[in-house]
Every structure is written in C-alpha cells, then in structure tokens.
Amino acid sequence: MKILLIKDVKTLGKAGEVKEVKDGYGQNFLIAKGFAKHATAEILAQHKEDERIAAENLAKEIVSLKDLATKLDKAEIVITKKLGQNGHLFGSITKDEVAHALLEQHNVEIDKKHITDKLSIKTAGKHDLDLRLGHGIHATLHVDVVGE
C-alpha cells in the first residue's frame, strides 16, 4: 500500500514523503492515527501542487528579505540617551530600543530576535549591528548613539 505521510514518523520518514508499507500497518495505524493518507492519484497531485506553491512562496519571501537587507545596509538609526562621564551611557542600548528606533525612523519593523549581537553598546558614537533576517540573509545596521 502506498501512503503519503502527513506527519513525521520516526521509524518511517518525514511529512510529505510517499512510502510503501504493509496494508495492515498503513490502514490500521498510520491512516487511523492521522499520520498518513492513502496515496491516490488525486492526493499525490494535490501534494505536488502544494509543494509548488510553497516553493513559490519561499522564493518570494527570500526576494523580499534580500530587498530588506539592502535597505537596512544603507540605513542608519540615531538613538539618543543620557550620557555620564567620559561619554559612557547610563545603562546600555537594548534590542527593543534598536527595533523601536528602526520602526520610527525608517518604518521597518523587525523582530528583536533578528538582532544577533549581544548589544554591548555602552558608549556614544557609531556602531554596527549584525541582523540575521532568516534563510541565511544578513544585514548590517548602522547605529549612531548620541547624548542628550
């Protein structure tokens, strides 16, 4: 019996794979428990169409992330903080502050988890932050910290 796995099965394979299994195992366990569907021509055609659509969506997402990376590489944000003696900040710049400043100044919303550096910005001046946007795409954001 041919089946199409809907969920990962540790001993059999990953979701989306077509496998040949014994009739009893396929019917009584895999299909009954919702791990697989009987691999008919219609189901296989639908699965192939779903994979094609997913690949197109992934390609569109990668293009948009590359455009965002290009935009971020050219962008510079300015963060104003109180300075102590010798140009040191009271506290440090947080990922939330960087994400908020990027949204306010360039209308670009990113999740703070994309900022990979540990953000040890404790002095005024220009700093570069590495951003990982996903799918192996990186950008460098230029941050200028100025005192009040």
From Swiss-Prot:
Q: Which residues form the signal peptide?
A: none
Q: Which domain of life is it from?
A: Bacteria
Q: Is RNA-binding there in the keyword field?
A: yes
Q: Name one GO cellular component term.
A: ribonucleoprotein complex
Recite the UniProt keywords alphabetically. Ribonucleoprotein, Ribosomal protein, RNA-binding, rRNA-binding
Q: Which GO terms describe its molecular function?
A: rRNA binding; structural constituent of ribosome
What exactly does this protein do? Answer: Binds to the 23S rRNA.
Q: Which family does it belong to?
A: Belongs to the bacterial ribosomal protein bL9 family.
> Per its UniProt record, what PANTHER family does this chain match?
50S RIBOSOMAL PROTEIN L9 (PTHR21368)
Q: Which NCBIfam families match?
A: L9
Name the chain's protein. Large ribosomal subunit protein bL9
What species is this protein from?
Sulfurimonas denitrificans (strain ATCC 33889 / DSM 1251) (Thiomicrospira denitrificans (strain ATCC 33889 / DSM 1251))
